[in-house]
Amino acid sequence: VRAAVNVDLTADGSFRRRPGYRLVKPGEYHSLWRNPVSGQVFVAEGAVLNVLSPDLSLTPVFELDSPEPTDFCEYNGNTYFRGGYYDGKRGRPLGVPTPSVTIEPVAGGLPQGRYGIALTAVNDAGEESGASRVQFVEGTGFRLHIQSNTPAVRAYITDGHGEQLRLAWEMPAGLLSYQITSPAAGDWLTSGGLEPLPKGQIIRGHGGRLYVAKGDMLCFSEPLRPHLWNPGYGFV
């Protein structure tokens, strides 16, 4: 044989016609990936990430920040990609957005003092955001004016002239204002200074953390909080 086109030579020396291919779904697709655990197949069309079904139908699950190719990884039952993850039911952004709040003093039952107040948001999966910037207000009670699109918001306050924040109340985010007039007695705040993990070119999970390569920097999440990182030290 001097020349052969579209022919494979097998181990026993015989010839076999090479399988062909055909167009089954036109479109500008990229970032095709199969989750090795769940078996789900993902493909992006422009900036829209889809789940590809066996019948080749597409189900949009997430809006990427650009039409650039994305990396994937499987970790803790989720499929992660640039800026988000898929939990088997829906796509979600990495990390819950921190709520914004304005505070005004009102008459209440707290001892007169200087109180620190910070808020976190909670999504429908029970995941908590990083805390808002601590604001200090003088008085005996406070009215919070909240802006958040999550199902719930948690308010943390210090003791009068204290520094440690404790949970005072969890309230529906649809409640645009709320008054705190009694001392906090809940859990201590543990998400101060944390932000959603940044987007990058490569994402991997290991040992209770997510790792994101962003340019020449490697960012890593807090342990057992894979969607939040501390920008003060969570990178190399």
Where are these regions (language model features)?
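N-terminal low-complexity, intrinsically disordered "leader/linker" segments enriched in small/polar
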Residues: 1-40
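Disordered, low-complexity "stalk" and linker segments at domain junctions of extracellular
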Residues: 25, 55-208, 212-216, 220-225, ...
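Short, surface-exposed charged micro-motifs
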Residues: 31, 40-41, 71, 202
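Segments forming glycine/polar-rich beta-alpha architectures that bind adenosine-containing cofactors
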Residues: 44
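Short, surface-exposed beta-strand/strand-loop-strand elements in extracellular ectodomains
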Residues: 50-51
